[in-house]
Amino acid sequence: TEADDNEVKRRTGAASAWIRQAFEEARQTNARGIFILFHANPGFEFVKGSHARLGFDEIIELLENESAQYSKPILLAHGDSHRFRVDKPLRSHSNQTINHVTRVETFGSSNVHWIRIAVDPLSDEVFSIQKQIIKKNR
């Protein structure tokens, strides 16, 4: 519906402004890294323009563009599809992996465990990820 389309535009605009502000502040303060946490899986693994990425193409493109201008470690964390994974989801305009960007997706309702994110600004990687398995939930 038109109302749904308007809501997507409003949310995308707000998220985009927030992401731009986060990267700008990181550049101005010479931050050692950026950690962005969000709920939904934006569909990094799907083809641009596909239905699975509906409403997220603009956000992913913004993350790719901002990451190209900020070479320090970036951690993107989310849930939603509820399958633990750690990967390098972003690509440059020349389709090269953006290696300083890592995505971690947390466990979900059918597989309840948790993830510990440690931050060490003195480390080259800045962020470390440890899955925490709850024995009784195996």
Model-derived regions, located:
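His/acidic metal-ligating clusters that form di-metal
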Residues: E2-L90
